[in-house]
Amino acid sequence: MRAERTAIVSGAGKRVGAFIAEALVGDGWTVVAHVHHSEDQVAEGTTKVVADLTDAACGAVIFDAAQNLPPVRLLVNNAARFAWDGFGEFSALQFDAHMAVNARAPALLIDELTRRHSRGDALVVNLLDSKLAAPNPDYLSYTLSKYTLAGLTELAARALAPRGIRVNGVAPALMLRSSGQSEENFEAMHANNPLGRGVEPADLVSAIDYLVDAKTVTGQIITIDSGHRFLGLERDVQFVGDA
């Protein structure tokens, strides 16, 4: 049974984060749903917490929302910044902004979990990107930030195993239409992989469920991409489809 356990999900007000939070509630978890804006909606049955992930105090703010709830046994670092830059258009501002949200905030949240974890087991799931297994230089700052998060996954797993905290990553392929991507392109590219099956948010939830139950798995990255990485594409999928 997973009752009397709390899960914290960052970026839980929209897209995949909202799907994860709702699924966890349905599976019996007490869920703290982080959002960036006070007007952001969250899944029914969750506890909403508003925090700016670029703020160094974000970890404490988010975990304070779980202070009177059951012990935190799951942290899903889902929130991510995804904005364009690339070689020839590289932006120091974009780099810093991506690193703050996609790498530093997860580190702060993991550190806060470490400070507050007293006994029992806990799991951190960092959401990565399947492009790390078949990289291309599009969305450069975003990609670099996800590489950093992948490194954090192993470092934290090594450091926190003696405390009973497991740290793993899940790296999904395209699940929902990206910003700037046409609906036509998404439909064409979603199932453009060797298995011929587009990755869905439910597949991501299944991977998280597996990691919750796999008590001896830590420091691993699960790529869920229907073999998309085998295609070895040189551009982001939205550009390939429009070529």
Model-inferred region functions:
Residues 161, 166, 218-220:
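Short, small/polar-rich loop/turn modules that mediate ligand/substrate recognition or access, typified
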Residues 123-148, 153-162, 174:
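Catalytic loop of short-chain dehydrogenase/reductase
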Residues 78-84, 227:
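Conserved NAD(P)H cofactor-binding loop of Rossmann-fold oxidoreductase domains
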Residues 201-224, 229-230:
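C-terminal substrate-recognition "lid" of short-chain dehydrogenase/reductases
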Residues 13:
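Conserved glycine-rich cofactor-binding loop
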Residues 86-87, 91-96, 189:
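Substrate-binding pocket helix/loop in short-chain dehydrogenase/reductase
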Residues 27-41:
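Conserved glycine-rich Rossmann-like NAD(P)H-binding loop of the short-chain dehydrogenase/reductase
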